C-alpha cells in the first residue's frame, strides 16, 4: 500500500544533511558543493588541489555554509578512509556521497598508442576511486540509517563517442556495473546508489578547446545534440542533486543521462 509523503520543497532538500563531494574544488564538483550548501547541506570538499579546496571552502563558509575540506587522492584507499572518518567525526554523520572525481587522457589515442600506465591512470581515478570512496562511506551511511550515493559515468561509457578513447569508455562503463551491483547490495540498508551520465559540458580546458574550433566544427558538434546546444553548468548539477535528495527516494540502481539527447541520437 502506498504511503503518503510530504512534498519536499527544493530549498529544503539537504537541510542538516552531510555530503562528501569528490573532485569538489573545481568545475562541476565545485558547483555541486555550492548548490548543496545553498539548499541547507553541510559539505565536505575532497580534491587533490589544496589551493582550490581552500578557496572553495572559504567561499562556502562566506555564504553561511558549514563546510570542511580535505586533500584526497581517491586512488589511495588509506587516504580516502582517513578523510571520510575525519568528516564523520567533525559532522557526526554522513548522508550523501557524490563521487564526481574522475579523469581521462589529455587527448584520445588509438589502441596501439595507449600504454599500460595510461590505462591504469584512467581506470584507477574513475573506477578504483569510486570504489574506494563507496567502501569508506557505506558504513557511515548505514550508521545514519540510510543515504544516497551518486556516481559519475558518462555518455562515453554508453556510446561509441569518438572523443573519449578506450580507457575512458571502459572506465565509465565499469562504473555503471559498480553502481547497479552496489545498489543491490546496500539497498536493504536504505542506501540508494545511482549514476549520472553527462554528455559534453564546457568547463576549463574543454571550454577553451570548444572555443578554438572553427565555426563549422562547432556546428557539427551541436548538430549531434537534439536540443541543439551545450548545457549550462547548473543543468548538469541539478540532476545530481535530484539523485542525492529524497525526491528520488524510490530510485536506485539507475543511470540518468544528461546530454541533451546526444545518447539517443547515436
Which residues are covered by each model-predicted region?
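Short C-terminal tail/terminal secondary-structure segment
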Residues: 2-10, 108, 241, 252-266
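Canonical Rossmann dinucleotide-binding motif of NAD(H)/NADP(H)-dependent dehydrogenases/reductases
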Residues: 12-44
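Substrate-binding pocket helix/loop in short-chain dehydrogenase/reductase
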Residues: 108-111, 115-123, 217, 221
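Active-site helix of classical SDR
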Residues: 134, 171, 179
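Alpha-helical segment proximal to the catalytic Tyr-Lys
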Residues: 139, 184-188, 249
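Residue(s) in the substrate-gating loop at a strand-loop-helix junction
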Residues: 154
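A conserved structural motif in NAD(P)-dependent oxidoreductases
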Residues: 225-236
Amino acid at each position: 500500500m502506498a504511503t503518503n509523503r510530504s512534498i519536499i520543497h527544493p530549498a529544503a532538500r539537504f537541510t542538516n544533511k552531510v555530503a562528501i563531494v569528490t573532485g569538489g574544488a573545481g568545475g562541476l564538483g565545485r558547483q555541486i558543493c555550492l548548490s548543496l550548501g545553498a539548499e541547507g547541506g553541510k559539505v565536505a570538499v575532497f580534491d587533490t588541489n589544496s589551493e582550490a579546496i581552500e578557496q572553495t571552502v572559504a567561499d562556502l563558509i562566506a555564504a553561511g555554509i558549514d563546510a570542511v575540506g580535505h586533500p584526497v587522492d581517491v586512488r589511495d584507499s588509506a587516504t580516502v578512509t582517513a578523510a571520510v572518518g575525519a568528516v564523520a567525526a567533525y559532522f557526526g554523520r554522513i548522508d550523501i556521497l557524490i563521487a564526481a572525481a574522475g579523469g581521462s587522457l589529455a587527448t584520445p589515442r588509438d589502441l596501439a598508442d595507449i600504454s599500460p600506465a595510461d590505462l591504469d591512470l584512467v581506470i584507477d581515478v574513475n573506477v578504483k576511486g569510486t570504489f574506494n570512496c563507496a567502501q569508506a562511506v557505506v558504513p557511515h551511511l548505514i550508521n545514519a540509517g540510510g543515504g544516497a550515493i551518486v556516481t559519475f559515468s558518462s555518455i562515453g561509457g554508453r556510446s561509441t563517442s569518438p572523443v573519449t578513447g578506450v580507457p575512458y569508455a571502459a572506465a565509465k562503463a565499469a562504473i555503471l556495473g559498480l553502481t547497479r551491483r552496489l545498489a543491490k547490495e546496500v539497498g536493504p540498508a536504505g542506501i540508494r546508489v545511482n549514476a549520472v551520465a553527462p554528455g559534453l559540458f564546457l568547463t576549463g580546458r574543454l571550454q577553451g578547446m570548444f572555443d578554438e574550433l572553427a565555426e563549422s566544427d562547432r556546428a557539427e558538434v551541436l548538430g549531434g545534440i537534439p536540443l541543439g546546444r551545450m548545457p549550462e553548468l547548473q543543468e548538469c548539477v541539478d540532476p545530481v542533486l535530484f539523485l542525492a535528495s529524497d525526491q528520488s527516494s524510490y530510485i536506485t540502481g539507475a543511470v540518468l543521462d544528461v546530454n541533451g539527447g546526444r545518447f539517443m541520437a547515436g
